[in-house]
Regions:
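Classical Sec-dependent N-terminal signal peptides that target proteins to the secretory pathway
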Residues: 1-25
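A metal-dependent hydrolase signature that marks the N-terminal structural subdomain at the beginning
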Residues: 24-100, 104-110, 257-269
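Pan-zinc metallopeptidase signature
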Residues: 29-35, 200-269
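Active-site metal-coordination segments of metallo-dependent hydrolases
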Residues: 45-55, 148-164
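Active-site-proximal beta-strand/loop segments in catalytic clefts of secreted hydrolases
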Residues: 83-86, 101-104, 138, 147-149, ...
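Short pre-active-site segment immediately N-terminal to the catalytic Zn-binding motif
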Residues: 113-135, 151-152
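Active-site recognition of the HExxH zinc-binding catalytic motif
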Residues: 135-148, 162, 166
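Post-HExxH zinc-binding segment in Zn-dependent metallohydrolases
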Residues: 156-194
């Protein structure tokens, strides 16, 4: 099967702030595109929030999401990404807004620093936090697109938009696999921070468990390029590894093709 491989995004290196940042490679003067997705920032209340706002702006993640949306998932009603406040990350269907607290970025950064991400994985904690933010923005934008387009989801919507965020990174963002792996690692870090047991209510939660989300994301990354990521699933027991690798290759193709029934490449419109 042929996948859309158009590269919309290029990665940069900016001083010592981030190892990898994202930026738009196609600026559009079209007012319709410009108004498709709107980014707003609440006034930072502390010096820490001011720093976070600046780091988010410098990272270019918003431009990446805007480019992907303009190219693949246009909204009937403009979507607003609102940074700041206490709620989120979440998509609010009542206001058609994605809410991202400044504290979410700070929490992600803390996880990557605490787990010595640069020492263990060769990527800075800032890169891990930015990658996680990008995956989260695409995840929440996925909820918004499902609501906006009235897409029927058979199964957990949270799993569906996790998959969407990951295949968008893999198919359209340069070094998107690295970003997806960072986001998966964040799921693993959160899982390690949990008690050894789940509350009964969590078994009927809309989200899969963090460790499931970790392996599901890695599965798609492996399936996108088995040769490049041949060791990515080595945590899986040998008794299951061969079958899981075969499944992940097929799973990536199926998820990509299924989502492209709803994604609209503007070059083909």
């Amino acid at each position: 099967m042929t996948h859309l491989k158009q590269a919309l995004i290029y990665s940069l290196v900016i001083g010592s702030v981030f190892a990898t940042t994202y930026a738009s490679s196609e600026a559009s003067d079209d007012n319709t595109l410009a108004n498709n997705l709107i980014v707003e920032y609440a006034t930072p209340q502390t010096d820490k929030e001011k720093q976070i706002k600046q780091e988010i702006e410098l990272s270019g993640v918003n431009d990446t999401v805007i480019d992907l949306s303009n190219q693949l998932f246009m909204f009937k009603q403009p979507l607003v990404i609102q940074y700041g406040g206490d709620d989120g990350p979440l998509y609010d269907p009542q206001t058609h807004q994605v809410l991202i607290p400044y504290g979410f970025y700070a929490e992600s950064l803390n996880y990557f620093e605490k787990n010595q991400y640069e020492k263990e994985y060769g990527k800075s904690a800032q890169t891990g936090a930015v990658d996680t933010l990008l995956h989260t923005l695409l995840h929440e934008a996925g909820h918004a697109y499902i609501e906006d387009q009235k897409i029927a989801i058979l199964g957990k919507e949270e799993d569906a938009v996790d998959n969407l965020a990951t295949i968008l990174l893999l198919n359209y963002v340069e070094h998107g696999a690295d970003a997806a792996i960072s986001a998966a690692d964040m799921f693993a870090f959160e899982s390690e921070d949990r008690p050894e047991y789940y509350d009964l209510g969590e078994y009927i939660d809309e989200h899969s468990f963090d460790l499931q989300r970790y392996f599901s994301t890695l599965c798609l990354v492996y399936g996108s390029d088995p040769e490049a990521y041949k060791n990515l699933l080595d945590e899986v027991e040998n008794d299951y590894l061969k079958d899981r690798k075969e499944f992940c290759i097929e799973h990536f193709d199926v998820i990509t093709e299924n989502w492209h029934q709803y994604l609209k490449d503007s070059d083909e419109a």
